[in-house]
Amino acid sequence: MSEYPRFSPAELARRRSAVEETMAKAGVSHLLAYGASGVGGAVGWISEWPATHEAALLVTPGEQDVLLVQHYNHLPNARRIATDADVRWGGPDTVTSLIDLLGARGTTSLGVMGPLRFAQHQRLSEAVDTVVALDADYVRLRLVKSAEEIDRLREAARLTDAAVAAMTDAARPGADVRALAAATEGAYLAAGATNQIHYFAVTAMADPQMCVPGQFEPARLIQAGDVLTCEISANYWGYSGQLLRTFTIASDPTPHYAALHGAADAAFDAITASIRPGAHASEIVDASGVIEEAGFTIFDDLVHGYGGGYLPPVLGTRSRSHRPIPDMRIEEGMCLVVQPNVITTDEKSGVQTGQMGWVDAQGWHSLHDFPRGLVRLG
């Protein structure tokens, strides 16, 4: 048994082939996959090393990959985890080391995937003939998952379910909202997962002041009569689950919150029924019309792709659309989070429900097992 989760050689070869095909279409002779501070998934997708402080992976067809990492003390662990790469310290300056490598390999053109800073991009542009942004191409490579990726996402979903279960055990009158985060993370850290997100909103049902979970927990005590909404994702080696739920605290749901959640449940059912291979993104938006028919709207995104990033299609409703509906169709193997955050138009009250699922020939299927519904705690 490996010390760290790993994909099979066949899966990594599939990715490598897709990357080299992308490079050929873009007309580049080298690829830089770059990541920093945990951002930049291409590094891990190709090499299996999750970018820590900084990582630069140089890919040249016919040559061994070179992975430059920062800081120096990260080098031993990167050598244990990275697959099929010559792992080196990035030196005092990673871009300088990268430019030296490019010079040795014969610099012509460079494709880039990842969040390079402006100054880094400028220096690389001065060192090579052509720099081509391949971020959009990387996103396309991540849209359709392999069977092994679905298995990894299923494990992430299992750990996310466990996190929400632990959070509900902690959500009692008198508990600090910040303790919910501790309970959430405690459910999956020992299994090798880390926090992707845990967002909470706690407000009084009788006088609601929050319609969507927040990114930072307040120093507030939970009280009987509160409503708790959450959005939780456990990250298991580059793949995250996502579960959204609403709970009431030591009190039954008020008629108002029952109506909100009823609309959210109806929207969830209509949206998931509309998702199938070949369905256009506009069909999914149309299915959400039950929300407006009930007199409500949304704040959070309605649907988004997931598994390797926050992926297309990112959709809203007709009453809350922050961007044009993309001209794209659903494909078998995609993963989509369906998450109707049904709220009042004054943005004072709202509920969350939904979860991540994957698409096969028959349609959308949940990867989570946590029960649905508006549930009373205590």
Residue ranges and their predicted role:
Residues 1-378:
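Active-site neighborhoods and metal-handling regions in enzymes and metal-associated proteins
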